Amino acid sequence: MTQPSPPPSPTPPDWPCCGHGTTPENPVGCRGVHVSGHTACLAHLADADRDAYLAGLTPGTDIDHRGTPFTASLLASLLDAVRDPTTGHPHLGVTRFGSATFQELAWFESVTFEGAGFESVTFEGAASFASATFHFGAAFRQTTFQEGAVFTSATFPGSAWFMSASFQKGVAFRSVTFRGNAEFLSATFEGKALFESATFQGNAEFRSATFQDNAWFDSATFQSGADFRLATFEGKALFESATFQSGAEFRSATFEGNAWFESAIFQSGAGFRSATFRGSARFASTAFGGHAAFDSATFVGDVWFTSATFERDVVFWRAAFERSVSLGPLVCGGRVRLSGAVFSGPVTLSIAALRLECRRTRWLSTAALRLRYATVDFAHAVFEYPLTITAEATPFVLADGRPVAEQVLADVVDTRVRIASLRGVDAAHLVLADVDLSWCLFTGTVHLDQLRLEGTCSFDAVPSRIQRRRWRPVWFTQRRTLAEEHHWRASQRTAVRGWNVAVLGAGHVGPAQMAPVYRALRKAFEDGKNEPGAADFYYGEMGAA
């Protein structure tokens, strides 16, 4: 909605102004700067004086028309006076339009500006700068566009300043090239904001900007930093197939509508810390080449990371997921960090990663974790509904039948899924399938006797059958054993070779702590009708006792 014009300021401008049309309500009158050699602005010059002034202009002339009110015909006369006969397009030198008012259509298409100053200008009609070229900077600070604005295919070889600009209707920056910095700090976009296929070679600054309608950045390229911190997207935020070649920051941004980053490429770091996604968050087929941070983010709507690829760590520390979540299938060449996150709805995680960290993660509904390669730390995780951790032997398959590519894990030979810790977990609703438990720390786990083990779940074993303690041979009966027992026995003065002392996080655990663990696992195996496994843990229980 177009905002009403503010009342005239009683304070005169910093330049000698025209003063035409003064009234008690407007003691300053026209604020247009004097045309050189005259005491009136361009709009209020006598016709003969205006014609003489325009006739004296040549392409590339510097002009100063600050505060001047322009009609469409007056602007057309000015641009015709500086039209370059070689190109057929107007060519302005350093141009000063600060605080001017363009009362009708402002047509600057294909104009070349050696320097453009449009600070605090009001465009009451539509404004078009399509295919314009702004050499040595373009300043639109605190400028108001009351109708549509078009910058399609414009080129900004220098910096472009749109800080606190107000676009009250739609604005199009399609296919624009910003070679310098593009600064839209605290800008307000009340209508649609179209930046499709725009190229930002310098920094793109949208910090604290407000997009009240849909914002399109599809296929845009950000070659330097992209800063959207504290930005608010009230409509859709569309960054599909956008490329971020340097760091991208969306810290504390708010997405009221859908946020779509499908097939986007983040070649460096991507920061979404403390961001809020109230609509759906789509990161399907998105590629993250650097560190990806979603810590303390809030996801109110649905979340998709199908076929997303992370070359390094991705962090969801203390993130909140309020609805159903489908994370994956995704592939991560580093760690997926979900520690402290809260999942309020049903969860399906399909993850191929080196490590999955879920320390103190809260699961408030059912959860299914399908994993490849990962070492999983589940210490002190909280879940009150069934939770299943399953190791997948083959690559994940998408809905269309295509396997998920795992190039970032191509050098990893061992595809086993290992559980590193279940300490502090209530295992009453936990199901483990086909996972390696040889490194798993169990002491401190509650209701371990209700743990369900399915498929092939492997434990560590005692050392090979014959070892020597000093000169005497020592025989070991082969059985399943806990990582804590390995650590404790390897720490004894009389330990034989084969016990593993390097069990990370085992701490000070002895027979008194291990005996109840063996007892609970024995019962779990007995309830699962696995008598040989139960016998192994019976021997462990007796040995600890």
Language-model features and meaning:
Residues V35-H44:
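Cysteine-rich micro-motifs
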Residues A502-H508, P532-A545:
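Cytosolic-side membrane-insertion boundary helix
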Residues E25, G37, A48:
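Cys/His-rich zinc-coordinating "finger/knuckle" motifs
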Residues R452, A515, R519, E531-Y539:
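Conserved positions within tetratricopeptide repeat
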Residues H20-T23, C30, H44:
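Short Cys/His-rich metal-coordination motifs, predominantly Zn2+-binding knuckles/fingers
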Residues P6-D14, C18, G29-S36, A52-A512, ...:
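Tandem repeat scaffolds
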